[in-house]
Amino acid sequence: MKKLFIICSFDCSYQYYAETVDQWVKEQGEGIVLDYDLVKINDHKSHSFYTVSSLEEFVKMLDTEWAKEWDKANNCKDIVYKLEIVE
């Protein structure tokens, strides 16, 4: 299980972005995305936290033809960080 933090900027509205992420997780994330939270920073930026079962499988979700086309159409840019617990 991996924890991720993603900074995302986009040209579409935040509402459309959030609806698309919800749909994407439901359709492609079963068994991969265990939990996620989106945080609206402004109308064109979001921070999100994901718990995923496999980093490799999550990266494949980001790299599908559908995801690439959506990113291009909405000028969506992601910066993905892997989080680790400090003990």
Roles of regions detected by a PLM:
Residues 1-68, 78-87:
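Short S/T/G/P-rich N-terminal loop/turn motif that feeds into the first structured element of a domain
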